[in-house]
């Protein structure tokens, strides 16, 4: 079999096991796909994200990172809300552009591209700005391959 290259933006390396898994045709209407992959993934994500998974759900989005970020910001931040964006580079700045496009009220805390977001600084900022209803940040960046939290 001819080896294929996975061409995506960013410095992404793809292991042989991932390439092998990609060779399987998963149909979105198949029970195996929906029950054994999608539902399990949603359940696992809830287990990571909250201590009370019965109060929340997850929605999987297929698209670029910017597509997913815009979908979440556009669908969850209302005109009466205020968003705090913790920006540590181009992706965080892009969230500001998205918020402006949707005419949303937001503040932005700027951190260096290779700097972790300071939990203490954000906590202090939130304590002094009670009008903020939502917080957003990029937890990992493809260009730098760093985790920021």
Language-model features: locations:
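A general structural motif
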Residues: 55, 80, 131-132
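N-terminal "arm"/small-domain region of PLP-dependent enzymes with the aminotransferase-like
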Residues: 1-32
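Alpha-helix C-terminal capping segments
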Residues: 74-79, 101
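Conserved N-terminal alpha-helix of the aminotransferase class I/II PLP-enzyme fold
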Residues: 22-71, 90, 94-100
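PLP-dependent aminotransferase-class I/II
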Residues: 103-137
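Conserved PLP-anchoring active-site segment centered on the Schiff-base-forming lysine
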Residues: 77-93
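Single conserved hydrophobic/aromatic residue that forms the stacking wall/gate
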Residues: 138-149
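Hydrophobic anchor at the start of a short beta-strand
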Residues: 58, 83, 106-107
């Amino acid at each position: 079999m001819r080896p294929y290259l996975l061409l995506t933006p960013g410095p992404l390396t793809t292991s042989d096991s991932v390439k092998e898994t990609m060779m399987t045709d998963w149909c979105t209407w198949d029970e195996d796909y929906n029950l054994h992959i999608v539902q399990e993934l949603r359940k696992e994500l809830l287990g990571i994200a909250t201590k009370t998974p019965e109060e929340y759900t997850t929605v999987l989005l297929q698209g670029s990172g910017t597509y997913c970020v815009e979908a979440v910001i556009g669908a969850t931040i209302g005109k009466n809300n205020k968003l705090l964006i913790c920006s540590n580079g181009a992706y965080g700045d892009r969230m500001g552009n998205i918020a402006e496009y949707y005419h949303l009220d937001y503040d932005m805390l700027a951190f260096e591209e290779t700097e972790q977001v300071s939990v203490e600084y954000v906590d202090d900022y939130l304590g002094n700005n009670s009008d903020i209803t939502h917080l957003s940040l990029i937890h990992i960046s493809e260009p730098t391959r760093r985790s920021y939290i």
